[in-house]
Amino acid sequence: MALSAALRLQSLRSLAPHCKLFASALQSHTQQPCRSHRLAPTDDELYQRTTVTRLERDSAEFMFIETYSSQGFIINGDKVVGPCAVIPKAILQWNVGSYKDINLESLSLFHMLSPRIEILVVGTGDRVERLDPNILKFMRQKGVAVEVQDTANACATFNFLVSERRITAAALIPPQLVPKDPL
């Protein structure tokens, strides 16, 4: 097959000076194909889908944060120790120590979920702490609104948004100073 293609190409070359139609055909067959597609993955393609181990017993219709303490949270009757990510129908451990550890990587889960999260409520502990403006801008570009509050208000805001049936997630760091620790 390669030999017949080479013979056809040779015959086209011999006819090319006599016919303009064959000259354009010869050029299109002898030029290297132009590659216009990307060969390197984009940032979103680097993150592959993964499986998640869910911490709650039964998937409730809505996630509801019942209480919080310096140790963690009680969400739908399940005790969660340490920082956590609350997404529709799942509770995940969130690997941050303080608000200073919140970066694009630690929030990457929230913009990759399907269906897309409308609002992410971030609880930064005892006080409202400012996050890097580039992080907030990036999340806005991904279509996720971010509300940063102290953890007590973040829990209340999350519960309110969920009660309105909004597609909401929460990223919560337990506060260190709680007057009465219910856990």
Swiss-Prot record:
Listed InterPro entries: MTH938-like_sf, NDUF3, NDUFAF3/AAMDC
Disulphide bridges: none
Entry-linked Pfam families: DUF498 (PF04430)
Annotated compartments: Nucleus; Mitochondrion inner membrane
GO annotation terms (biological process): mitochondrial respiratory chain complex I assembly
Example of a GO cellular component annotation carried by this entry: mitochondrial inner membrane
Keywords: Membrane, Mitochondrion, Mitochondrion inner membrane, Nucleus
Family indicated by similarity: Belongs to the NDUFAF3 family.
Role according to the record: Essential factor for the assembly of mitochondrial NADH:ubiquinone oxidoreductase complex (complex I).
Name the record gives this protein: NADH dehydrogenase [ubiquinone] 1 alpha subcomplex assembly factor 3
Organism: Xenopus tropicalis (Western clawed frog)
Originating gene: ndufaf3
